[in-house]
A protein has these predicted regions:
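Membrane-anchoring alpha-helices and their flanking helix-loop junctions
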Residues: 1-146, 155-218
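Conserved SAM-binding loop
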Residues: 149-151
């Protein structure tokens, strides 16, 4: 709970300190949806004590490339929020999208969170890091969204990640967030290779579910 409260406080600080204003309505939309998603996540995992422990304190075996991913992607995501706040709240570099475009971006943002949460609930091995969870008896998840693509959690992350700058009202923030999205796609490919090599029955699962990220596309 302390960690969750701290995360919410940091998110609020990034959004509203960077914009320099509290009447930043796009910031409030982003903040409220993000907090609602965090609260729903806590409720969905209310009986998944093993998964909660794994996500808070992952076991041994995190891959070196995953450490590199976090070192690069975290500042990019934070930077995107800061750039968006400065852009929309102070400098006004970006023109405001129309109501229809903004509504569409918000819908995709919410959809991304929904897909991410669905995957998190369906997969009891939804760790926060890339590792083989031999200590937890990891098996292949074939339930829920995993019937349609092999990495639905990353699909959800891509959707709400790429929509974050637009929900915050900034086109310029797409630059750092776009780089973060490229890194996430690379992480997905590396993790899929790791699972194919080291997780029992994953190669057979790949034959049954052909799509890596986008169902029916790739």
């Amino acid at each position: 709970r302390v960690r969750s409260a701290l995360g919410i406080a940091i998110l609020a600080g990034l959004v509203f300190l960077s914009s320099g204003r509290l009447d930043y309505w796009q910031g409030w939309v982003f903040f409220c949806v993000s907090v609602a998603a965090a609260m729903l996540s806590a409720w969905l995992l209310r009986d998944r004590f093993g998964l909660i422990a794994e996500r808070l304190h992952p076991g041994k075996g995190m891959k070196w490339w995953d450490k590199g991913y976090f070192m690069l992607s975290t500042p990019l995501y934070i930077g995107a929020i800061i750039v968006a706040g400065i852009d929309t709240g102070r400098r006004h570099w970006s023109s405001s999208p129309g109501a229809m475009i903004y509504g569409l971006c918000l819908a995709v943002f919410v959809l991304g969170h929904a897909v991410f949460l669905w995957a998190k609930r369906a997969n009891p091995f939804f760790s926060s890091v890339a590792r083989i969870q031999s200590d937890r008896g990891q098996t292949v998840c074939r339930e829920g969204p995993y019937k349609f693509c092999r990495h639905p959690g990353y699909l959800g992350g891509l959707l709400f990640g790429l929509m974050t700058p637009l929900v915050l009202g900034s086109y310029w923030a797409l630059i750092p967030q776009g780089l973060a999205a490229v890194l996430l796609i690379g992480r997905t490919c590396l993790e899929d290779r790791m699972l194919t090599k080291d997780l029992l029955w994953y190669a057979e699962y790949k034959q049954a579910v052909r799509s890596l990220l986008f169902p029916g596309v790739w």
